[in-house]
C-alpha cells in the first residue's frame, strides 16, 4: 500500500461519529488541493465532515502539491468530507478530481448533490499506485451545490483525493455500445437471450432496453462459415437501426480474425499486387457501405481495419512499409466518404495502455498523410497495463492528434469456470485486475470505471465505449474458428448474458451518463 503512514494526530483521533463540522459556504471551491492546513488536519479548511470524522484527514503525498485528503481507519467506517457552495449561477458544472483507492469499500465515490436535481456520482476506480482523473457533471438549478467525498468502508480500506476543481462545463458519453457480431450465429445454433428475471426476448432489443445506443459489427470478406459477411451485416444492421441505435462497421479486410498477431489477406486477394489491393480495399468498403445506405441503414462510424498495430493485408500493408500502408488506409477512407461524407472514420489499435506504441503508430500515420476522424483503442485490463496507463494513452492520443477517442473493445469476466468444453481465455484468479474480482459485481465495476476514464478525457474528446462480444454465449457450433464447427468459445464468461442466458448486472453501465 502506498498510503503514507498516519501522522500521530490523525492516528489518535476517535473514529466514532461526531456532529457534523460545517464550513462557511462560498461560491467557489476552496482548498481543492488540501494545502491550506498541512498534514493531520481532521477538518481541512473550507471543508466539513460527517460520520467517523477521525477517518478523514489531510496527509503528505499530494499529486501536484504536498498534501492530499485521505480516508482510512483501522476499523469499519463511514465518512463524508463535503463542501457547500452557494451563490452559483445556474447552469452546467463539472467536478474534476484526481483519486487513488486500494479498493474493497462498500462504496467510495465523489458526488454532487443538493444542486436542484438528481444527485450525480462517480465511483473511485481501484488504483493503488497511480492517480486517476475522474469527473462528475451536474446541472445546477437552485444556485447551490454540495461537493462530497464519501466512504463506506471496511477496516483498512483507504482512498486519496486531490486537486479538485469545480468549473462550468459538462461531460458524458455519446457512445454506449457493444460488439454483437456473434449474435446471428448464436441464435441460429439455439442461443436464447433473457431479461434478468428470465423472460426470453430479442437480444438486440434487450440490450437496447438496458441503454445500449451503438452496435459494432465486424465484416469479413468470405468467411468459411458464411457469418460476418456482407449479407449478415446487412441483416443485422436492419435490426440495429430498428431499435434506434447507431451502427459501427468494423472492416477486417480478411476472411477471418484480423488482430496484431495476424492480418491475412482474403483468399480472393491473395495474389494481388499492391495497386490491386488498394482497389480491393476501396471496392469492398464501398460495396458493403453502399448496400447499407441503399437499405436505409447507413453506417454512422467505420473502422478501416481492426487492431492494425502491425498494419493490414500483410505483407504489402505491414508497418514495415508505411507508405503502402498509408495508401491502403486512405483507400478505405475515400470509399467511406464517397458513400456518406458524414460517416466517422476511425483507426483502431490494440494495447490501449501502450503510450509509446500508440504515439509511434499515429505519428507515422499522420506524417504520411493518413486521413481519419477518430481513434479507437482496445483495452483489456488483464493484458494492456493499468487503468492509469490507459488514461495516459487515451488522453495523449486525444490531445496529440486533436481527434475524439473511444474505447473500441473491452470486457471483463463475471466468473472463471467454462460452460463449454474449451478453457476460457481468462480463467485464473491470478490473471484478473487487482480490485476487480471475476463476479457480476466485479464485471459491473470494471465497466463503470473504464467508462468514467473515457468520460474524463479533456475537452470532451472521450466519445464512449464498446463492450466486446456482449452476446457470445456458449453454443455448440459458435466457437472461435469459423472453419471448425466443433471449436469452443472461450469467451462466454465475459459475455453480458450469464450461463442461464439472463441479462447480467453489468448491463447497467449502458446507463452511464
Please name every model-derived segment.
Residues 27, 33-76, 202:
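Extracellular glycan-recognition surfaces and repeat-rich motifs
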Residues 34, 135-164:
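Extracellular beta-strand ligand-recognition surfaces/modules
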Residues 34, 79-105, 134-138, 163-164, ...:
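Extra-cytoplasmic beta-strand recognition segments
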Residues 42-46, 79-81, 103-114, 145-149:
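Beta-strand acidic-aromatic groove motif in beta-rich domains, primarily in extracellular
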Residues 115-144:
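Extracellular carbohydrate recognition and processing domains
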Residues 188-192, 392, 396, 415-449, ...:
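Aromatic-rich peripheral "rim/lid" segments of glycoside hydrolase catalytic domains that contact
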Residues 203-204, 338-344, 357-433, 440-444, ...:
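Glycoside hydrolase catalytic-domain groove-lining segments
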Amino acid at each position: 500500500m502506498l498510503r503514507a503512514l498516519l501522522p500521530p494526530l490523525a492516528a489518535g483521533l476517535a473514529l466514532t461519529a461526531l456532529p457534523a463540522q460545517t464550513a462557511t459556504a462560498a461560491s467557489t471551491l476552496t482548498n481543492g488541493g488540501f494545502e491550506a492546513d498541512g498534514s493531520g488536519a481532521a477538518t481541512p479548511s473550507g471543508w466539513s465532515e460527517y460520520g467517523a470524522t477521525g477517518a478523514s484527514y489531510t496527509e503528505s503525498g499530494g499529486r501536484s502539491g504536498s498534501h492530499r485528503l485521505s480516508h482510512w481507519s483501522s476499523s469499519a467506517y463511514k465518512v463524508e468530507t463535503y463542501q457547500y457552495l452557494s451563490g452559483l449561477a445556474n447552469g452546467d458544472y463539472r467536478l474534476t478530481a484526481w483519486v487513488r483507492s486500494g479498493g474493497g469499500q462498500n462504496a467510495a465515490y465523489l458526488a454532487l448533490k443538493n444542486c436542484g436535481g438528481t444527485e450525480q456520482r462517480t465511483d473511485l476506480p481501484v488504483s493503488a499506485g497511480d492517480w486517476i482523473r475522474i469527473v462528475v457533471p451536474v446541472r445546477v438549478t437552485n444556485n447551490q451545490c454540495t461537493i462530497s467525498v464519501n466512504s463506506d468502508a471496511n477496516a483498512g480500506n483507504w482512498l486519496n483525493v486531490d486537486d479538485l476543481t469545480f468549473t462550468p462545463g459538462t461531460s458524458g458519453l455519446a457512445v454506449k455500445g457493444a460488439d454483437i457480431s456473434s449474435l446471428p450465429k448464436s441464435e441460429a445454433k439455439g442461443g436464447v437471450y433473457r431479461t434478468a428475471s428470465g423472460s426470453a426476448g430479442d437480444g438486440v432489443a434487450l440490450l437496447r432496453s438496458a441503454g445500449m445506443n451503438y452496435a459494432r459489427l465486424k465484416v469479413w470478406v468470405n468467411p468459411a462459415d458464411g457469418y460476418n459477411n456482407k449479407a449478415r451485416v446487412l441483416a443485422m444492421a436492419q435490426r440495429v437501426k430498428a431499435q434506434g441505435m447507431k451502427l459501427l462497421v468494423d472492416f477486417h479486410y480478411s476472411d477471418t480474425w484480423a488482430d496484431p498477431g495476424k492480418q491475412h489477406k482474403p483468399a480472393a486477394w491473395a495474389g494481388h499486387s499492391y495497386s490491386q489491393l488498394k482497389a480491393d480495399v476501396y471496392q469492398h468498403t464501398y460495396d458493403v457501405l453502399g448496400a447499407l445506405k441503399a437499405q436505409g441503414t447507413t453506417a454512422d462510424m467505420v473502422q478501416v481495419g481492426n487492431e492494425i498495430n502491425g498494419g493490414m493485408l500483410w505483407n504489402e500493408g505491414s508497418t514495415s512499409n508505411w507508405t503502402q500502408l498509408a495508401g491502403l488506409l486512405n483507400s478505405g477512407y475515400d470509399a467511406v466518404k464517397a458513400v456518406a461524407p458524414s460517416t466517422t472514420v476511425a483507426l483502431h489499435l490494440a494495447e490501449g495502455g501502450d503510450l509509446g506504441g500508440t504515439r509511434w503508430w499515429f505519428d507515422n500515420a499522420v506524417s504520411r498523410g493518413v486521413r481519419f476522424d477518430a481513434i479507437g483503442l482496445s483495452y483489456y485490463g488483464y493484458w494492456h497495463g493499468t487503468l492509469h496507463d490507459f488514461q495516459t494513452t487515451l488522453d495523449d492520443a486525444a490531445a496529440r492528434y486533436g481527434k475524439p477517442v473511444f474505447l473500441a473493445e473491452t470486457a471483463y469476466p463475471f466468473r472463471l469456470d467454462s460452460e463449454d468444453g474449451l478453457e476460457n481465455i481468462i480463467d485464473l484468479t491470478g490473471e484478473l485486475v487487482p480490485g476487480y474480482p471475476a463476479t457480476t459485481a466485479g464485471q459491473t465495476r470494471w465497466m463503470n470505471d473504464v467508462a468514467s476514464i473515457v468520460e474524463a478525457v479533456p475537452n470532451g474528446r472521450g466519445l464512449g465505449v464498446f463492450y466486446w462480444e456482449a452476446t457470445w454465449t456458449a453454443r455448440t457450433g459458435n466457437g472461435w474458428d469459423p472453419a471448425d464447427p466443433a471449436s469452443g468459445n472461450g469467451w462466454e464468461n465475459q459475455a453480458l448474458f450469464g450461463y442461464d442466458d439472463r441479462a447480467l448486472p453489468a448491463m447497467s453501465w449502458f446507463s452511464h451518463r
